[in-house]
Swiss-Prot record:
It catalyses: Mo-molybdopterin + L-cysteine + AH2 = thio-Mo-molybdopterin + L-alanine + A + H2O. Belongs to the class-V pyridoxal-phosphate-dependent aminotransferase family. MOCOS subfamily. The active site is at C410. SUPFAM superfamilies: MOSC N-terminal domain-like, PK beta-barrel domain-like, PLP-dependent transferases. This is Molybdenum cofactor sulfurase. It comes from the Eukaryota. It holds the Pfam family MOSC. Its EC number is 2.8.1.9. One of its GO terms (molecular function) is molybdenum ion binding. Residues 632-773 form the MOSC domain. The modification Phosphoserine is found at S731. Keywords: Molybdenum cofactor biosynthesis, Phosphoprotein, Pyridoxal phosphate, Transferase. It comes from Drosophila ananassae (Fruit fly).
Length: 773
């Protein structure tokens, strides 16, 4: 077990706590320092006093303002242990603007390529749209940057092509906190890349004989870690100051090495302050001599830049350096210690059955501070291994006063890597399901589309970590899902508006309906353009109203004829169409039209006699031909049939009006076939997803939309579920798996019956809320 060892002394911690007393006053636990850290009270007070003391105006007007800006420029270089001899400082709006500036101005030459790491911020992906002048664009994995770059001492081909390649990666992943070893910077600059990565755009070709330049996205890293630019010399460094100081916002920087400056091409645009002169009557102009002035278009955000001085001073005052450690080194040790402690505690959270509560996402573990920062990403799982949506976690955390981040954190590539999403899964999430960045669409078929992230700053305390652990234990180890949902719904008014919308989706929904017009044949699914379906006093309209009988009048089922599942029904234009391969036949839906010239017959369903109308010779011949059995007939139920148990009205179903299946229970079977195919095996009318496997077995009553249902009991399964409903092939593992999971009992799904006797115009609709009573 990891014991927490504080980095700060008691007196230092007391001073820090005093700077952030608003957290205690507001009963808030702030755990999103990777989003932004918090500003100290004395910091903003000193910044305001500075504005009150001085006349700070446009730097083109006032020399004092220019001196302040130069002071900050010097302080930035000092903060990163470098000087103006080696780096230029260009002030930008933020790290994103810095990345954009590099993409727009980097000169790739004729054969240069753009390489970026998969686990990068969205802004790096945005660079691809600005580097169309590169020959090709390649995506690198972290391993291809660190493990597969050529080893030191090996020799790269001497550049022969007029090409410069740009490699962009994050010093610290803002999703997981993983740190790419910064030795990769010099290694790639000197030796190039052993493999270019996955080619995704442009011309694919040989790249090893280019000069290589490094663009380091340092926004997440420098917030809590020292970056020594004398030791590591990336060509471009992008950052946002609010990540470090919390205040001010709206100002970032691009640090450009002297080598990097030589790789910038001539600008296609200039703004105020970037030129010595520009003639209006000709195209002649002359850029400033100073490199940074050429790229700082217009008036700088000078008030924000001046405010950075107090950011540097406050940080050094609140977290003073020691004989051995500088300020940022101490902050790095502090946040890593908290993350290491939290990770260890999360690993110990177990459900009563021993299943882990937490799924962690990291690469290197938390033992080595040079490889892992103060970020912990995770998802919560149930005792059956199902995932809890991150939207629910966000709601529960907010109601406990905990501010954290959920989703993909503007890093879809890291999401893809850590969640194991291939291209098809990405399409299912973003194209077919319609998820967008920043929403709370957290689960698709039980699989997470994002994660929960907590991240630490120098003002984070061990108490904050314990509050998070307390919330997870009380909400996910000591309560049932229905209790948790009820708690959230009762307190929903206290949530921010964006989370209030998520509360509306916490309850399970009716995902899909299916009717089986012909008993034992394929389903007609209510989905897509068909969102709703009417109810009758027997169940869903047209469900199991027809059945096929043999020459002896006995009902034909898949137990005797598996090919029945290949007969596909289609209801349209007042007829029931039956399809088998390319062959089709139809019968009228209207019972009056059917009864006009039909003979009455009697058959049996579950030992009960049922009256039916013969549907005629044409459909009989069609069935016999396609199924290869003589004497088959299609009958339609005409007489009333009641349950022997409670006199409920039934169609040709075996036992109850409706059969409900929970997709979470289906997922627990873990078959290799597509989930939808496994769901189809159970031939249910109503498909929901509660997020908890076999939770439906505890239901007594439930409502779907406005319709109330009584649970009749579990469905006892036979070997018919071993039949693949798409192919008709048998596979015994379905039944054996259920038997194993249910301790020898063959139960899967539940029978339900509508409580209200009033039919009216009742209907069920996909998307209806499922409320367990």
């Amino acid at each position: 077990m990891t014991l927490y060892s504080p980095e700060f002394s008691e007196s230092e911690q007391s001073k820090i706590d005093a700077e952030f007393s608003r957290l205690t006053e507001n009963k808030s636990v702030y755990l999103d320092h990777a989003g932004t850290t918090l500003y100290a009270e004395s910091q903003v007070k000193a910044a305001a006093e500075q504005l009150q003391r001085n006349v700070i105006c446009n730097p083109h007007t006032c020399r004092l303002t220019g001196d302040f800006v130069d002071q900050v420029r010097y302080k930035v270089l000092e903060f990163f242990n470098t000087t103006s001899e080696d780096y230029h400082v260009i002030f930008t709006a933020n790290a994103t603007a810095s990345l954009s500036l590099v993409a727009e101005n980097f000169d790739f030459g004729s054969f240069g390529n753009f390489h970026f790491c998969q686990e990068n911020h969205t802004s790096v992906l945005g660079m691809r749209e600005r580097v169309s002048h590169a020959k090709g664009i390649y995506m690198l994995t972290e391993r291809e940057i660190t493990g597969c770059s050529l080893q030191n001492g090996s020799s790269k081909e001497k550049p022969t092509d007029p090409g410069r390649s740009l490699v962009t990666f994050s010093a610290q992943c803002n999703f997981s906190g993983y740190k790419i070893p910064l030795d990769a910077i010099g290694n790639i600059q000197e030796n190039g890349l052993h493999t270019p990565g996955k080619h995704i755009w442009g011309t694919e070709g040989k790249t090893s004989n280019n000069d290589y330049y490094i663009c380091l996205d340092a926004a997440s890293f420098v917030a809590t870690n020292p970056l020594d630019l004398k030791r590591y010399r990336p060509d471009f460094v992008c950052l946002s100051f609010y990540k470090i100081f919390g205040y001010p916002t709206g100002v970032g920087a691009l640090l450009v090495s002297k080598r990097g400056a030589e790789a910038f091409r001539d600008r296609k645009f200039f703004g105020g302050g970037t030129i010595n002169y520009a003639y209006p009557h000709t195209m002649e102009y002359q850029l400033r001599e100073s490199f940074h002035q050429r790229y700082e278009d217009g008036t700088l955000p000078f008030l924000a830049i001046v405010g950075l001085l107090e950011g540097f001073r406050t940080l050094e005052r609140i977290v003073p350096k020691t004989k051995e450690l500088a300020t940022m080194e101490r902050i790095s040790r502090h946040v890593h210690g908290l993350a290491k402690y939290l990770e260890d505690q999360l690993k110990q959270l177990k459900h009563p059955n021993g299943e882990p509560l937490i799924q962690l996402y990291n690469k290197a573990g938390y033992q080595d501070r040079t490889r892992q920062g103060g970020i912990v990403a995770f998802n919560v799982r149930t005792d059956s291994g199902d995932y809890v949506g991150f939207g629910e976690i966000a709601c529960v955390a907010a109601l406990h006063g905990i501010l954290l981040r959920t989703g993909c954190f503007c890093n879809i590539g890291a999401c893809q890597y850590y969640l194991g999403l291939d291209g098809d899964a990405m399409d299912a999430i973003y194209k077919r399901a319609g998820r967008i960045c920043g929403d709370y669409f957290d689960l698709i078929d039980g699989q997470p589309t994002g994660a929960v992230r907590v991240s630490f700053g120098y003002m984070t305390t061990i108490h904050d970590v314990e509050e998070l652990l307390k919330m997870l234990r009380s909400s996910y180890l000591a309560t049932k899902p229905q209790q948790r949902i009820l708690f959230i719904e009762e307190q929903a008014g206290q949530l921010p508006p964006v989370l209030q919308k998520r509360v509306q989706n916490l309850r399970p929904k009716l995902l899909q309906m299916a009717i089986f017009p012909v008993k034992s044949c394929a389903a007609f699914k209510i989905e897509g353009y068909l969102k709703s379906w009417p109810l009758t006093d027997q169940g869903l309209k047209y469900d199991r109203e027809w059945m096929i009988v043999d020459m002896n009048g006995m009902a034909l089922t898949q137990k005797r004829c598996t090919e029945l599942c290949l007969i596909r029904p289609l209801i349209k234009n007042d007829v029931l169409e039956l399809h088998f391969g390319d062959s089709c036949v139809s019968v009228p839906l209207s019972l009056e039209d059917q009864a006009a010239d039909s003979a009455k017959c009697v058959s049996k369903v579950c030992r009960q006699p049922v009256e039916g109308l013969d549907c005629g010779e044409r459909v009989a011949e069609w069935l016999s031909t396609n199924l290869g059995q003589d004497g088959l007939r299609l009958l339609r139920q005409s007489g009333q049939r009641n349950s022997s148990k409670d006199q409920q009205k039934l169609s040709l179903v075996n036992q109850a009006q409706f059969l409900l299946v929970n997709r979470s229970s289906v997922r627990s079977l873990q078959f290799e076939e597509p989930l939808d195919d496994t769901v189809d095996r159970f031939r249910a009318n109503i498909i929901i997803d509660t997020g908890l496997a076999f939770e439906e077995l505890s239901f007594k009553q439930l409502s779907i939309g406005k319709v109330q249902f009584q649970v009749q009991g579990p469905c006892q399964r036979c070997d018919m579920i071993c039949i693949n409903q798409k192919t008709g092939e048998r596979s015994p593992e379905t039944l054996t798996t259920i038997s194993r999971l249910q301790s020898g009992r063959m139960r899967f799904g539940i029978y339900i019956t509508r409580i209200s006797k009033d039919t009216g115009d009742l209907q069920l609709s996909c998307g209806d809320t499922v409320l367990v009573e």
